[in-house]
Amino acid sequence: MDDGDLSFDFEGGLDQPPAGGGGGPAPHSSDPGGVGGGGGGGGPGDGGGHGRGRGRGSYRQTVCRHWLRGLCMKGEACGFLHQFDKARMPVCRFFRDFGECREPDCAYKHSYDDVKECNMYKMGFCPNGPNCRYKHVKLPGPPPPVEEVLQKILQIRSFNKFNQHRHNNYNQQGERPQHPQGSGLPNQNSIDNTTTTTAQPAVGQQAQTTNQQPPQQQQQQQQQQQQQQKPNTNDQVQSVPNGSSNQATRIATPLPQGPSRYFIVKSCNRENLEISVQQGIWATQRSNEAKLNEAFESIENVILIFSINRTRNFQGCAKMTSRIGGYIGGGNWKSAHGTAHYGRNFSIQWLKLCELSFQKTHHLRNPYNDNLPVKISRDCQELEPFIGEQLASLLYLEPDSELTAILIAAEAKKEEEKAKGVSADEAADNQDIVLFDDNEEEEEEESEEEEEGNGQESQGRGRGRGMMWPPQMPMLRGVGPMMGGRGFPPNMIGDGFGFGGGFGMPDPFGVPRGFPPFGPRFPGDFARGGPMPGMVFPGRPPQPGGMFPMGLEMMMGPGRGPLMGGLGMGGPGRPNRPVGMAPFMPPPPPPNNRGTKREQRRPGGERGDRYETTSDQGSRGHDATGNSGAEGARSQSGDRYGRSALRDDDSESDEEAAPRRSRKR
């Protein structure tokens, strides 16, 4: 069964147009489903739809766009027609936005004949702009004066204030033919329309009195008002009777005259924008510097429109006043990742500071960025000049933001500095904000002063900051080092401390330390603070407590330093060398076969030999107390080298090693 086989009783009245919108529309408006169910019997139906009362004229008169694609989720509650009708198709979006459609099989409508006229555009301004779904009809003649548009806006507000229906508002406007409705371009006088909405109540009373005057007197008053406004056409705020808005808008600097190029500039946080407003500078990424320099050299004005990330707002615009490359102090920028990666500073002049929402710029698309909305832009994305000018004009429609107070204070400070005769270079550097380089220099100076403040700390040897000082303990025979203890590399003395630039010890276990990873460089580095308990240092007497409550005397004997074999040598102590040690001597000749055989008999391998010599140092040191000075010197030289016990045939023999093996069993 086709739709043509269906017939309803009320279809006969659809073909008959209503006479002047009289009593005919009542039964049709009471049954909204009948219009949609009638299929194509009624034709376009827009002619009779306008006469149907109380806002039901456009109900299901246009085919639903979403239903055509199978995406409408409203079902029966949808106010559009869920039926394919060629005569009731909506206007093609390409034809509406670009004026043409290149699709030959496009099923949408390509004319504005059946589209309603926009009531907001009739009053002089439509906030939807070219994206409005209603028809914008330009009326002949000059645009109406600002006062007339203001009167209409105040009248609409007064009606809404007393909860009157909006359609009554439109009907009363249609009954007053003495006011010429309509306007030229939708952006004409847009600045005045938005700023004058905050007028005082006296203006509303004046508007009501002028409606009661005859048309001739109204025309004379309009001519006088136009003559008064002619010398103030350049000033956008003179027509506003509110003094507060006049004072707030006077701070903003108008856009410069002449050719301009516009760029979107992104800021990762608000702190950088406050620094820029305070100091009049900015810094972008190094990859964008060449683009801005080329624009600065090729055109008179380079306008930067700023936007902070994740705010969905534009915060204002500024003019680029210097080329990137020269030295300009200030900055201390903060990046999103915590480390500054910006380029060099350049000076700017702030023109306007406000908060413009992205929702008010959805109709502006950038041809330089694949015709995407201006809100979708990267850092230093250039705008098409016409689009950039429109976006900058929208910034001036918004009230000044709180950053304007910072800008006023910064400008006042600059004026004071000029009056005092401060040079431009000194004025560019803000004393309240310190650069990163200055902080590093201050830290270096403080560290040098602390090192020079101690008397004997300037004496010492070695390079760098020294090394870590873990706790030392006498090693037993054949055992490995304690966790955190340092080993004995070659050419090192018995305590594992190097005479040269220091031998840094790896610390894979993260043991507790008494000092930072680098130990003291000079003997007096511990004058300002004592080490942790249990820390023992070469060349210093052990302190009781900490690791050993009774001190190291119970292990090493009274008056003896830790791990120091042999007899003490006379002479003053030297930095980084234990007290009682002999001067550094060249190593002895290579070992013989006897030492090699003994190394093979060691159960602990090479690692056990390294630490076994340490235990031998302590045992032989106690045994050598009653020997002569020559034997003590030989044992001392044997203690200073890790493998000297295996190389000296006179100091140790096989007979001496035999009892030790027996004791080991």
Curated annotation (Swiss-Prot):
This is Zinc finger CCCH domain-containing protein 45. Gene3D superfamilies: ph1033 like domains (3.10.590.10), Zinc finger, CCCH-type (4.10.1000.10). Residues 33-50, 561-573 have a biased composition (Gly residues). PROSITE patterns: YTH, ZF_C3H1. GO terms for cellular component: nucleoplasm. One of its GO terms (biological process) is mRNA splicing, via spliceosome. Residues 260-395 form the YTH domain. Residues 169-200, 239-250 have a biased composition (Polar residues). It comes from Oryza sativa subsp. japonica.
